From Swiss-Prot:
It comes from the Bacteria. Allows the formation of correctly charged Asn-tRNA(Asn) or Gln-tRNA(Gln) through the transamidation of misacylated Asp-tRNA(Asn) or Glu-tRNA(Gln) in organisms which lack either or both of asparaginyl-tRNA or glutaminyl-tRNA synthetases. The reaction takes place in the presence of glutamine and ATP through an activated phospho-Asp-tRNA(Asn) or phospho-Glu-tRNA(Gln). This is Aspartyl/glutamyl-tRNA(Asn/Gln) amidotransferase subunit C. Heterotrimer of A, B and C subunits. It catalyses: L-glutamyl-tRNA(Gln) + L-glutamine + ATP + H2O = L-glutaminyl-tRNA(Gln) + L-glutamate + ADP + phosphate + H(+); L-aspartyl-tRNA(Asn) + L-glutamine + ATP + H2O = L-asparaginyl-tRNA(Asn) + L-glutamate + ADP + phosphate + 2 H(+). The gene is gatC. It comes from Methylobacterium sp. (strain 4-46).
Amino acid sequence: MSVDAQTVRRIAHLARIAVSDAEVPPLQDELNAILAFVEQLGAVDVSGVEPMTSVTPMAMKQRDDAVTDGGYAREIVFNAPLSEDNYFLVPKVVE
């Protein structure tokens, strides 16, 4: 895949970046180099390589999530000027 000058201008427009005519050719070259590198990465044979999330082994095991209500509702609304059933009460501000 190759990026032309029109594509560079379109990308700049979509990104809301002001690009002068003098800046288009260098940007075009940079984008083409990036795409060439990505194509190189796509050509690498990774069959047999196990997917990983980190290059270093995990020292800590992940724990299962436990969903709770937190148990802090009373402490949270304790200092509120007005509260009811563990909810903050605020004056009506919109008619």
